[in-house]
Amino acid sequence: PVVCLFLILSIGISHGSLDNQKGKKLSQLYNIKKSYFFYLIYFLVGISIIIFWLFFPTISLILFLVLASYHFGKEDTEFLVNNENVSNLILYFLKGALIIIAPLIFHFVETINIFKLLLIQNEKFYSFLNFIEENNILLFALSISLLSNIYYFLKDFKTTNILIFLDFFSVIVLNYFLTPLIAFTVYF
């Protein structure tokens, strides 16, 4: 776990270093001249998220998982998309949800234990996860994610669209054979 955490943090920090470029674009968009203003807001948002997590860990985790699903779906797919519309936003979420769904399907108990390490003590949350696992709702969600991948594969077909399925099946294989933390580290 320590090695995985180190890799995620070190790679994640370099991945997050691109936020500086996004900050410059936002500053230009909103006509903000002082760059320190972006960093101040960035820092305050980070601190606010940590405080919010400490007081409302379950809500924070749910919001994080929803945003992560959208983020991963968009990052893995945007090279195929020419325009941003509501249907693409939904498809990004459905595609990216695979990153959240796969560990729950293949390593349910271990994934729950990771959630508990993140200060999630809400029994209703765990009852809900047990319900969706026992009633095969996770498999249904996996099927929906697969359908979003098929849509992107067939839409404006190019040879590069094959990457969509390589991505989908690599996430499945990683999560089938590896623990959730190692699978996510390799994916990330």
Regions found by a protein language model. Give the residues of each.
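Transmembrane helix interruption/hinge and helix-loop junction motifs
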Residues: 1-2, 51-61, 175-184
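Alpha-helical transmembrane segments and their membrane-interface exit regions
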Residues: 9-18, 65-77, 188
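Short juxtamembrane and helix-loop transition motifs at transmembrane-helix boundaries
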Residues: 17-32, 57-58, 141-154
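Multi-pass membrane catalytic core of lipid/isoprenoid biosynthesis enzymes
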Residues: 32-56
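Alpha-helical transmembrane segments of multi-pass integral membrane proteins
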Residues: 69, 75, 91-111, 134-152, ...
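Short aromatic-rich membrane-water interface segments that cap or initiate transmembrane helices
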Residues: 123-137
